């Protein structure tokens, strides 16, 4: 009896550890609007004819038709001895296929390391980073360099683009918490994406946008300070654009900017009005296996002090010089 009791305690101990680590229960045939996920990004993988959806939380969902999904699966494997620590928060993960491999761009936060305190806000060690895998469903593991961006500045929401010079780049946000005017920046990556080259360059600032607004202490309307969720695209006419998200007072909203030079260096000209309805944002674009261009975003609402975010799809048209949102898409 004592042996059985000891074995039971051991099993319960392992169960507690797994529960604390947040090992997810895999579910099948889950409708898209039943999934709670911030920053959804979908890779349509031609080889497997499968859609892979990532986002905040370091988890992955799989679907054959965009209607129902299987998951979530844990696919990100980080180095506990790196700056991320043993249990980093993972935000805004994206999958990109490049030169025969799959890359996992995401934001990692080490809550045990504080780099600064500004205006009463504690700023933790946070940065965009890249993992790699030979398969779209992972596992995604670290590469050569464990630091892509400066450790003393919080960065987030890194995405991927190959510019007209043929070089790969990470485009990311300099978080507003430190300078109260968030930035959009680029940094060159090594040819195999295993690290960065040189220093980052500011492309534009949150205050450059005509549509994102907030109120100061006196209630005056001023430019919003947040930059969030960049995604690069090129229209069928060759126009380089960037989706990005901020706020219009209390609404979470997505806008778009276009590069006059057709390169990452811009200058970036912002559209006067947001491209999506209020409280839809952090979007990205992908084509279905049938060739339809879709935008994945999450809806945003606050409920009892918590954010509720659900993935949604919009059909879009890129046949002209400007991206046009047609409307909600139901698979």
Feature map (PLM): residue ranges:
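Bacterial Sec-dependent N-terminal signal peptides
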Residues: 1-21
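Carbohydrate-active catalytic/glycan-binding domains of CAZyme proteins
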Residues: 19-331
């Amino acid at each position: 009896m004592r042996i059985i009791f000891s074995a039971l305690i051991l099993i319960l101990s392992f169960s507690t550890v797994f529960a604390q680590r947040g090992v997810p229960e895999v579910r099948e045939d889950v409708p898209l609007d039943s999934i709670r996920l911030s920053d959804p990004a979908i890779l349509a993988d031609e080889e497997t004819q499968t859609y892979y959806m990532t986002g905040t939380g370091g988890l992955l969902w799989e679907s054959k038709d965009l209607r129902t999904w299987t998951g979530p699966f844990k696919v990100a494997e980080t180095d506990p001895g790196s700056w991320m620590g043993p249990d980093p928060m993972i935000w805004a993960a994206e999958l990109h296929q490049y030169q025969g491999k799959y890359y996992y761009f995401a934001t990692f936060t080490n809550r045990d390391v504080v780099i600064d305190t500004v205006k009463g806000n504690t700023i933790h060690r946070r940065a965009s980073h890249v993992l790699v895998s030979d398969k779209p469903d992972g596992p995604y593991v670290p590469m050569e360099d464990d630091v892509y961006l400066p450790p003393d500045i919080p960065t987030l929401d890194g995405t991927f683009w190959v510019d007209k010079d043929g070089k790969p780049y990470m485009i990311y946000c300099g978080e507003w918490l430190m300078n109260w005017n968030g930035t959009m920046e680029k940094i060159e990556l090594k040819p195999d994406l295993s690290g960065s080259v040189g220093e980052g360059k500011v492309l534009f600032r949150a205050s450059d946008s005509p549509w994102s607004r907030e109120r100061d202490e006196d209630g005056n309307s001023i430019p919003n300070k947040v930059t969030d969720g960049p995604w690069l695209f090129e229209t069928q006419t060759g126009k380089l654009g960037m989706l990005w998200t901020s706020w219009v007072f209390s609404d979470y909203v997505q806008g778009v900017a276009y590069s006059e030079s057709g390169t990452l260096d811009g200058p970036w000209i912002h559209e006067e009005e947001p491209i999506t309805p209020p409280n839809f944002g952090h979007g990205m674009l992908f084509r279905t296996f049938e060739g339809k261009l879709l935008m994945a975003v999450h809806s945003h609402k606050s409920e009892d002090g918590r954010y509720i975010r659900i993935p949604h799809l919009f059909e879009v048209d890129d046949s002209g010089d400007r991206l046009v949102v047609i409307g909600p898409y139901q698979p």
